[in-house]
Amino acid sequence: FTNEKISKLVTALKSSKKEIDRSYESDDWFQWSEGRVSLGKNKSINSSSRDFHSYGISVGADKIKDDDRDAMHGYVFQYANDNVDIGSSGTKLETDAYSFALYDTKLRDDHFFTDALIGISLLDIDQKRVIYGNILEGNREGQQIYGSFNFGKRIVDEDLNLNPGLKLDLGYTKLKAFRERTVVGDSLADALLYKEQNIKSALITLGVLLDKTEKDKEEDEIINHHGRLEYIADLS
């Protein structure tokens, strides 16, 4: 391991694992899960302030390929909720996304690696606008297909490790047409009609990750420094 902390931890685990002997086969699937929560606020002089919060959960499994021990593939189910409050009048936008994706990663010769992910999502969007006390609501459905492809190389040095890479993100989103409805009286003067939308996206990211390890022999400490530099081009 190039990371000294991980190497030290693995050594400790091996020494304490005398009575446990579990050998895994290539047919074994390894389950995993993760969750996330995000909170934020955006204030602007020229537009309404925005408070947003989101949360999500992912459950997946992956396995090492039978015919290639340097490759792994898997799948993941995801649920995400994004909620944005706009201004102080009650206008808000809430999106529920249900996703399924397949992914694959492979370590190649000379520390080259490739990652790929392809997925689909179902979107359920609830919109609420408040105009001079008139409350307008609407529900919109959508479908999405997306893919991400990453190519990189691990450059190992005694003092500094570099990971230059190139990533391509592609997406296609289709949103159904809908019309707002009022919940106050019968006034539809402010109601908007949204036509069907087809949105294409393409991003190219050039970047480099770097990490450096320092040892303090007197204190028996290992300090890791991490950094990232990226350039993102929107080709949409």
Regions found by a protein language model. Name each.
Residues E25-S236:
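Membrane translocator/pore-forming domains, dominated by Gram-negative outer-membrane beta-barrels
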Residues F1-K43:
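Interface/linker segment at the passenger-translocator junction
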